[in-house]
Amino acid sequence: MSKLQSEAVREAITTITGKSEAKKRNFVETIELQIGLKNYDPQKDKRFSGSVKLPHIPRPKMKICMLGDAQHVEEAEKMGLENMDVESLKKLNKNKKLVKKLAKKYHAFLASESVIKQIPRLLGPGLNKAGKFPTLVSHQESLESKVNETKATVKFQLKKVLCMGVAVGNLSMEEKQIFQNVQMSVNFLVSLLKKNWQNVRCLYLKSTMGPPQRIF
């Protein structure tokens, strides 16, 4: 049973889109779901981590890099998808600073089967620590659909603090699409929590430049 009131969510979305229309920016603002938790001890309780694919892509401009074998690198080139081959990864020489920089540069990584197995050896634990270990892409799958699936996936990961934020939409989307994404994100998040809604202290929606709107 979701405790999220549809009305409250719709109202918040309308307020956010209204405020942004009044003050046009020269970029498309992202809408973030901000989460505050309670009755949760990150030291003792299990730190959860989970991903859910949303019905609509929240960040179309999300930066993805393909760590590919020759075939995937060629496909990525044709699509205009940024990519690196094994030789380029070897050049990073497991240098922590360089791996960290790479992890920061992209929102997510995809990797061919032959490459993913070598990642720990080539790069060390850096991508994993950043919560950006690559998603496997086989040659049987379409690279383009895998990219879109990755763009539509959001990840909830509890670290040491009891608050987090995930992108659930952007201001070029229709209100109903934002609503569907918010609903799915919240319900998925609650399913990860030990005591479900009893662990939720507050939920806010916020556009990049706008004030937060409370929805729970």
Curated annotation (Swiss-Prot):
It comes from Arabidopsis thaliana. Belongs to the universal ribosomal protein uL1 family. It comes from the Eukaryota. InterPro entries: eL8/uL1-like, Ribosomal_uL1, Ribosomal_uL1-like, Ribosomal_uL1/biogenesis, Ribosomal_uL1_3-a/b-sand, Ribosomal_uL1_CS. This is Large ribosomal subunit protein uL1z. Keywords: Ribonucleoprotein, Ribosomal protein. The keyword Ribosomal protein applies. The gene is RPL10AA. Interacts with the GTPase NUG2. PANTHER family: RIBOSOMAL PROTEIN L7AE FAMILY MEMBER. Pfam families: Ribosomal_L1 (PF00687). One of its GO terms (biological process) is translation. CDD domains: Ribosomal_L1. GO terms for molecular function: RNA binding; structural constituent of ribosome. The keyword Ribonucleoprotein applies. PROSITE patterns: RIBOSOMAL_L1 (PS01199). One of its GO terms (cellular component) is cytosolic ribosome.
